[in-house]
Structure formats: structure tokens, C-alpha cells
């Protein structure tokens, strides 16, 4: 019904094979008695599977990881809202906790109304297809200073985008943590180009 909400989830969390399957449906007028729903009127299917072998002949390598993650979302009448496939092509975890990874994605979206992403930069309604890939590395969180850097490049609505994100973790004193994040985006659209910069700092005590 218009007020209903339903869903189901299956998980298979194991060391070699890790799988997940979930389905969720929210009616157009669903109104939770506690909390809030960020979006109504959709059906969403999300399957994920990962293969994570542990090479016995690579002394410095703890585990490899390969996987694919899908998301298929429609409105209540079955019209496509979003369809995304993320391929985690390769991830390597070393014995010291450091990691390196590479992946790619294909995204299909339907925009039902025009959207002004920035002043005088309007994305018109319609169907959009985008492709992109990312590469990154991170150090172990057990270090007093840990870091992560990732770069993404791909399609973005009517144009292209390049993104660089860095994270820094400082853990010099027990019970006190400092987290910093920096993200830079260089966006080029048919309606114009723009750049964004985001800073985030979190202190945990």
C-alpha cells in the first residue's frame, strides 16, 4: 500500500566468500512513527558478492579481494530511478595492514526534474549513463599516523569529473583521535565548469 514498508536481507559473511542480498520497498506516503525516511516511493534490490583468497606463497600479503556490488532502484510503478554496478576489480591487504585497491562503476540514472547543480549550471531531466574508475591506497589504522588517498575519474551528468580525496588519522594519545578529510572536485559540464573543495575535521575524545 501507499503507507507500507517492507524489506528482507540475507547475508553470508565468511572469510573466503562474502555475500549479501537485500530488498527494500517504501510506499509513496510511508511515514515512520520514529525517525525519518530519506526517500519514499521506491523499490530497491542490492546484491553483493566478494571473493577474498589468502595467498599462502606471498609472505607479505594477507588477503586479496575481488567483488561486484549492484543496486537496482525503481519507483513503485517499476520505472527506473537508478541502476549502478560497482566492480571491485582488485584489492590487496598486506600483513602490516596497508591496502591498495582499484575499481570501476557503471551508473544509469533518471532525473525527473531539472536540477540546478550550481548557479546557471542546470542538469535537464532525462536518462543519464556514466562510467568511471577509481584507484587508491591506505595505511593501517593501527599506526599513530594513518592516511588514505583515492582518485576518481569518470562521467558526471553532461560532462566529466575528476576527484581526489585524502584522509588523515592521528592517534598520538590514548582516547583522543583526530580525523581530517580533504576532497577536491574538478567538474566540466556542457553548461559550464566549476571546482569544489571540501574540508572536514573531527576530534574524538
List each language-model region with its residue ranges:
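Exposed, low-structure sequence patches enriched in small/polar residues
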Residues: 1-205
